[in-house]
Amino acid sequence: AMLATGAACGTSDDSDASASKSSSKSSELTGYDVSGVKKDDAIAKMLPDYVTKDGKLTIGMDTSYAPAEFLAADGKTPVGFDVDIAKALAGVFGLEADPETANFDSIIPAVGAKYDIGISSFTVTKERLEAVDFVSHFNAGSAWAVKKGNPNKVDTSDLCGKKVAVQTATMQETAANKMAKQCKADGKAEMDVISSKLQTDVTTNVVTGKADVFYADSPVAGYAIAQTDGELETLGKTEGIAPEGIVVKKGDQQMDEALQKALQKLIDDGTYMKILKYWGVQDGAISKPEINTPGTNE
């Protein structure tokens, strides 16, 4: 969950993260095969002309955020559960999916012009809803991860004296810095916040013992843990769960409703859950996509 108007989840606007230094294991994944998704003529007819005229569904995404959207081993092909959902939606619309890599904070302003939609782990917030529409498609929160067995006896209710790894420019970094200040104010042992641009480095810091615990978006944490082959485990429950959504041009009711119907179809026929299970993020599944509905903790 990212800060500012640009970011939700995802990294900062630093594009070197887009060079995706994902582990060799993660880069082997090519995505769930959605080629069997059939066009639904009734839903396709709901689309506005600007979307259908070139036969493509153009999607803006910051491909530096495994497992939602990142680059495959070739360094060019976008993969991830958001990518697969976008491809499946394009299938329902009878369009060709055209995912394009973009800096995170450039996506929202370009939806409706350069891109038909944006899918990039955007948390649905009241602030963002002033600029664009959203169709919710996933739920994410924040999660903690430690070495298996929690050898350093990390207690997330008191992290004073611990080393906490986070990704730069995330809401988790802000939260960790706030906790560190509180430790100091209370005269307790110092909490060390170790911030890295890439989540892969955040994970490595805990694996190697440089940090005691990391704090990240729940799907990112779950995926990162899976890549360590059992070296790490989650600590406690997912916190602060909020909806993520597909970005649509402000006030484009036709597109909002077409996406809502198409996504509901993919949920009802099981395609949506198969995609999430492929990436190990089924805990974030929703049953009903909603238009312009921010999280309750907003």
Task: Show the residue positions of the predicted features.
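Bilobed "Venus flytrap"/periplasmic-binding protein-like clamshell domains
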Residues: 78-91, 122-124, 140-198, 213, ...
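Ligand-binding clefts/hinges and TM-proximal coupling segments of bilobed small-molecule sensing domains
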Residues: 30-49, 174-193, 264-298
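Acidic, polar ligand-binding/catalytic clefts
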Residues: 96-158
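Bacterial lipoprotein signal-peptidase II cleavage site
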Residues: 5-21
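A ligand-binding cleft/hinge motif common to bilobed small-molecule-binding domains
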Residues: 122-129, 177-178, 207-240
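Extended ligand-binding regions for polar small-molecule ligands
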Residues: 10, 25-41, 91, 150, ...
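Extracytoplasmic small-molecule ligand-binding "clamshell" domains
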Residues: 25-118
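Periplasmic-binding protein-like
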Residues: 138-146, 226-264, 282-298
